[in-house]
């Protein structure tokens, strides 16, 4: 077992406000399509990340494809991307805005994947080029990006990460999202781009005790289960 030297368990000790995630949220102001996987997957993996972060790129290129094939594409885990720009302005923020603006047109993931795979080409010219390649309405994208829409939501993601105890990127949260008293079960915080095998151990442990899915949730769409206005014990 990897033990506490690898991961930290986040125990919520005050009343937690839970907002449920469903794939119906794709394209909404809240999520803009930042969800991969089945809405009724028993486990959710949330990533807090920065498009300019070298370790985030490492995770995307080395670990993510294997996680996607083993868990997301098979319906065992749903994946949520959250923005964590490390600076208050600059390329990281602009890249997050570009991805959100693509999401407004239902093309969040194609933009996300290009931002992580294009070898550091992150500037306004590159963003416009990617927008054209993935088939966005150029005028709408330029307006959205020029007005820096979604800034408030982007920094809300960062605040959410801070409440989980993250102060760097990438950071991951594993939480049960189907069946059972999820608000009473500790989440698992993974503070860094750990190897694929470490994710596998924690995910498989949670899946071993996961209840059988009863179909997609019917609650209003929004963000995944997160702690709001609460406190944590970090072990």
Each model region followed by its residue ranges:
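N-terminal secretory signal peptides that target proteins for export/translocation
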Residues: 1-6
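Bacterial N-terminal signal peptides
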Residues: 9-20
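Boundary at the C-terminal end of the N-terminal hydrophobic targeting segment
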Residues: 22-26
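A short beta-strand-turn-helix
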Residues: 27-43, 71
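Short clusters of hydrophobic/aromatic residues that line enzyme substrate/ligand-binding pockets
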Residues: 35-36, 122, 190
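Structural alpha/beta surface segment adjacent to cysteine/selenocysteine redox centers
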Residues: 41, 49-132, 137, 206-210
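Soluble periplasmic/extracytoplasmic beta-strand elements of cell-envelope proteins
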Residues: 44-47, 78-81, 171-173, 189
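C-terminal cap of thioredoxin/glutaredoxin-like
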Residues: 62, 129-235
């Amino acid at each position: 077992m990897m033990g506490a030297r690898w991961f930290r368990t986040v125990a919520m000790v005050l009343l937690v406000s839970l907002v449920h995630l469903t794939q119906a949220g794709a394209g909404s102001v809240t999520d803009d399509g930042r969800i991969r996987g089945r809405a009724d997957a028993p486990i959710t993996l949330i990533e807090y990340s920065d498009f300019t972060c070298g370790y985030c790129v490492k995770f995307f290129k080395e670990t993510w494809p294997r996680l996607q094939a083993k868990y997301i594409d098979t319906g065992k885990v749903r994946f949520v991307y959250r923005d964590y720009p490390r600076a208050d302005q600059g390329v990281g923020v602009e890249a997050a805005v570009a991805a959100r603006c693509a999401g407004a047109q239902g093309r969040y993931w194609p933009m996300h994947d290009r931002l992580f795979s294009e070898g550091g080409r992150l500037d306004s010219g590159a963003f416009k080029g990617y927008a054209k390649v993935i088939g966005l309405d150029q005028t709408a994208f330029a307006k959205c990006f020029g007005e820096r829409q979604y800034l408030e939501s982007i920094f809300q993601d960062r605040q959410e990460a801070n409440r989980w105890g993250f102060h760097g990127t990438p950071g991951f949260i594993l939480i049960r999202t189907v069946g059972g008293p999820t608000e009473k079960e500790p989440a698992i915080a993974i503070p860094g781009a750990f190897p694929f095998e470490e994710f596998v151990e924690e995910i498989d442990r949670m899946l071993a005790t996961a209840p059988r899915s009863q179909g997609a949730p019917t609650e209003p769409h929004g963000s995944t289960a997160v702690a709001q206005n609460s406190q944590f014990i970090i072990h």
